[in-house]
């Protein structure tokens, strides 16, 4: 194991130096004196402001930091950064055009640009970011290198592990986590990068050595407005790579591969097609758990170099060949996630053998087509986040051996009729191809919070679209009642699929506890998949 060597570090605190890179529209009248003062900490939450802190007023969706400038002044702030100067404020104001951009610029400067001292890998896409980032870290750690993590499940920086509140944290927290990693001697880190995080400048001033766009499908369109706008935000991550960086693209995804000639970085492709530089051949998904041959052809890398301005990477240590892989996580999507992670770590100089061994021992992420029960019948749990996710999950199911399928489906709440219509239309394309025993939809009123309650318009869209098939169903108000119905109908050899986003988060906990009550002698084994679980508690 590589020894972690802690770095020496002193926060940059002189206000003038901190603000040297800002796009400042106006400074306060006393700037010539103020710029030599030392600030204590940067703050974007007025409740945390202390003596000599610099408070940055950010306009959010629910609150505007400009409304709390008086509070920041009372609590001893040295100065504030604002977009809109406030009259009669007893606090020096540094006026900028974009406070969110200023937070990122200030945070990176304050923490002395920690991303430049790491091999930082950024992963974006509609589906699979979490799994791919964890696979990447597992391979890096298998080689004996500590690896920091920032993503949907947790933030791990060497000092602590905390549950995440956002996939991509705000810029101030992000730079602090990256600085902690450097301080703890980490040389590698992997980070999920969301489209919203990119749009809100959370990763501005963050240097990525490599990045991947693993796929793109309809997601967050309520925020971005269109697929084109969504893609524009996602593509920022890869277009921001410098010429020494590596852009990893999905050869089988049209949105991803379209970036091949739009980036300055070197390009590598993964997938199942012959165009992929790292690909899976002889793929078998009959059990649900993939086996395949990992194929890497150095000549294909050279072909990539001819198709793009830059050579992919140093080929001297890479030999042609195929390497058998058996995954412990189900689904076709797991194959793509594994290929993406492998392609990224090959850039670090790791051998294909280490990659194949590490991904074979990966246990998966909760609620990503996760097998939570394997008895007379099996139970899989999937978050059905969007149409691409639904397609991947049901395609994997269609290639598996089972008797019949019992699907418990949580209608998605407060995401609008359009999202629900697209989800049900995707479901309807698959339901005739699956061996359905029962389709059991639920509103999950007993488990969701206010922000995820299914609205009347969403129920109406669901019912309208379900008229297009002949599958009988009853909508259950409560998830627990829907799960009772699933257990009443399931037969040996069947699969129960727990399908849905927030409305199904509690599904595995509820159904496994019901099974444990039926079989108390095996209670511990039945409930084992819930250990360490975050969703649904």
Where are these regions (language model features)?
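N-terminal leader/targeting and accessory segments in enzymes
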Residues: 1-105, 302-309, 330, 517, ...
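ATP-dependent carboxylate-amine ligase
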Residues: 1-27, 51-54, 121, 306-308, ...
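Phosphate-binding loop of NTP-binding sites
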Residues: 16-22, 102-251, 255-263, 342, ...
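Residue-level signal for inorganic ion chemistry
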Residues: 53, 72, 106, 123, ...
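Short glycine-rich anion-binding loops that position phosphate/pyrophosphate groups of nucleotides
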Residues: 60-62, 195-196, 218-219, 253-254, ...
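Generic hydrophobic/aromatic pocket-lining and core-packing "Φ" positions
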Residues: 69, 137, 178, 234, ...
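Non-catalytic positions within long, well-ordered alpha-helices that form the structural scaffold/packing
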Residues: 69-74, 182, 398, 432
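Acidic, Mg2+-coordinating active-site environments of NTP-dependent enzymes
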Residues: 86-90, 210-379, 402, 460-465, ...
